[in-house]
Amino acid sequence: MHITSEPAILYFGTPVVLVSTVNENGTYNLAPMSSAWWLAWRCVLGFGAHSKTPQNMIRTGECVLNLPSADMTGAVNRLALTTGSNPVPASKIARGYRYDPEKFATAGLTARRSEAVAPPRVMECPVQLEATVESVHPLAEQDEKWHGRLLAIEVRIRRVHLSEAILAEDDSNRIDPDKWRPLIMSFQHFYGLTPNRLSDSRLARIPESLYRAS
């Protein structure tokens, strides 16, 4: 039996992505997100328009998409309620965010030089995708509650770096899905490719109702 429902969020489960970008002063920003999907060598990323990451991407035209494995929940959690925006936007203050100019250090992760773009890769992530911005699309423009608040950014993957540990034995251009265990975000909780929750996410402390447009 089904019932009509109106959840505040529709995060049914997608891979966590750590997006690295370059700030105005040349330092690095690193932000976790999970509103992402791929088709061919393109990826579409969903952001709040006033977040630091999309602002950096639009300004520089570059980013790196770093995909953590399921054993990296600790590092991702340490980033979960941080922002590179100073001052912190009111909407993020309401959710418990704080300004952090040293995201790599906070997460305990290592910045590694990229080959095709300026933002660094995350050395610990098994998948590292250097990318450039192709187009920016506002979302929900017809909804006065969301007008100007959401963006979909299409990026083109320029360089793919993969850990040898997740590659197929007979083909270095193919990932073995039996070896790759992505970290999944589902309704603000961390999961892997197993039925059980891996650990609690700090984002789960935020009431889902705070994500409704007001």
Name these PLM-found stretches:
Residues 1-214:
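Basic, polyanion-binding surface patches
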